[in-house]
């Protein structure tokens, strides 16, 4: 594992030979690399404790509150130079669970209410090719029908009470 900090925190975790040892690759030198990139958000919040009981892991983990996570995903969708279908997927996944943190959205996007949020989302949508974004995210979807989250995002924004 290698950790680097230059304005953002980068962590690279390599699993050499794992693909070969598990029979997933015939090449001994094949490796899996997991790259984690984070950057300071300069936004104070209280992490939530969540009991994790999956994947043979049982214990408490600290998590970002869902309202803040949704606001961060919306901000990423609006500000990314290269849009990602995964941002749309995440927004449609999180919205039924919470409302966005408007303090964060106000600081990052100058958005302080649902009408302003819808307006900025539609402005961004006008410049995007949803078919391209759907193709971008489709290899990562467990359920192929979830591609509709991308295709129907304009209707989702219209109907959602942010």
For the regions a language model picked out, list residue spans one by one.
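Structured mid-to-C-terminal alpha-helical surface segments
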Residues: 1-162
């Amino acid at each position: 594992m290698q950790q680097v900090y230059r304005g953002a925190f980068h962590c690279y975790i390599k699993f050499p030979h794992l693909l070969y040892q598990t029979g997933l690759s015939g090449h001994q030198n094949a490796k899996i690399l997991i790259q984690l990139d984070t950057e300071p958000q300069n936004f104070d919040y209280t992490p939530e404790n969540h009991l994790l009981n999956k994947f043979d892991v049982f214990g408490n983990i600290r998590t970002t509150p869902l309202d803040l996570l949704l606001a961060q995903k919306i901000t990423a969708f609006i500000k990314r130079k290269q849009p990602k279908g995964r941002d749309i997927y995440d927004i449609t996944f999180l919205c039924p669970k919470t409302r966005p943190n408007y303090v964060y959205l106000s600081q990052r996007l100058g958005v302080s209410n649902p009408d302003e949020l819808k307006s900025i989302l539609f402005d961004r949508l006008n410049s995007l090719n949803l078919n391209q974004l759907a193709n971008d995210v489709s290899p990562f979807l467990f359920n192929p029908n979830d591609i509709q989250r991308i295709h129907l995002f304009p209707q989702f924004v219209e109907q959602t009470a942010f």
